[in-house]
């Protein structure tokens, strides 16, 4: 951009990009993208396909996060959400809305390059996120988009074959193991319940009565961390059972990972029953997710049905 008439350089573009990124829910966006990339790499996809999976997923997650802040702009302003650039008036709602649609379009285009099964799975995943933003978050069914989206994430990562650009291996589409899909689904429950805990009062004041709100602080918190434990044991079972179980050090690492997740869940439940619905709970879920990501990476080809 050129200088203004008074000689001041226009620095709005970098600032706008930073504010858009801050409006995209970067923590969950990065976590989901890393999870998809790790699964894609673990099942043996070539580097370029892992990168394509990551690009498609990050575009979809950016669109979901941006749509959330655009649609919730008035509500966030009403409750004084200082962590939301739109609520603080630092960026226009229209700018965030446009970015949400653009990134959604990019996600659809990139998804189409992954191959038919992965493409359909990812478009449904992104649509589930938008459905949550658009109104499901206010209903008892608010947990459904999370179950669908996280359950489909392994399908996107494992089934991607690049056949849409003539790069498929010709061996047919791979499908994730049932336990990988189940792990994603129950992990989605944990993410949803924990993410809304710090906002229960603000949400109640603005008419949001989703699944976690109806459970209350203790009910939602306990459900979240119980789901994490279930996810950990699903991953453990997927590694030590079946036709090709891990052995030796692999068993040790699998068990240690499960123990770590259970310990983090215990800390989380203790905080919940102490009435501390802080962002610390969400950080515990993110930490648990990183442990599960490592375990999924170690599972390798066992992720494929």
Model regions and ranges:
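Multi-pass alpha-helical membrane architecture of UbiA-family
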Residues: 1-305
């Amino acid at each position: 951009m050129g200088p203004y008439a008074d000689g001041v350089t226009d620095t709005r573009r970098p600032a706008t990009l930073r504010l858009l990124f801050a409006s995209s829910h970067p923590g969950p966006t990065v976590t989901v993208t890393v999870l998809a990339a790790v699964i894609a790499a673990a099942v043996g996809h070539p580097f370029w396909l892992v990168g394509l999976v990551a690009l498609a997923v990050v575009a979809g997650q950016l669109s979901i996060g941006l749509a959330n802040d655009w649609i919730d702009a008035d509500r966030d302003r009403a409750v004084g959400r200082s962590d939301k650039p739109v609520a603080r008036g630092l960026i226009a709602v229209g700018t965030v809305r446009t970015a949400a649609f653009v990134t959604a379009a990019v996600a659809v285009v990139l998804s189409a390059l992954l191959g038919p099964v992965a493409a359909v799975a990812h478009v449904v995943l992104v649509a589930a996120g938008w459905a949550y933003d658009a109104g499901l978050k206010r209903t008892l069914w608010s947990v459904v988009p999370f179950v669908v989206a996280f359950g489909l994430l392994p399908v996107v990562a494992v089934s991607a074959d690049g056949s849409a650009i003539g790069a498929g291996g010709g061996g047919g589409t791979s499908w994730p193991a049932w336990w990988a899909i189940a792990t994603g689904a129950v992990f989605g429950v944990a993410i949803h319940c924990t993410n809304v805990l710090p906002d229960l009062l603000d949400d109640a004041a603005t008419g949001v009565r989703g699944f976690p709100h109806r459970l209350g602080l203790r009910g939602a918190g306990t459900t979240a961390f119980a789901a994490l434990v279930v996810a950990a044991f699903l991953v453990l079972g997927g590694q030590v059972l079946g036709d090709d179980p891990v052995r030796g050090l692999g068993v040790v690492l699998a068990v240690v990972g499960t123990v770590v997740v259970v310990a983090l869940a215990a800390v989380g439940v203790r905080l919940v029953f102490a009435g501390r619905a802080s962002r610390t709970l969400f950080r515990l879920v993110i930490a648990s997710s990183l442990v599960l990501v490592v375990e999924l990476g170690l599972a390798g080809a066992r992720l494929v049905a």
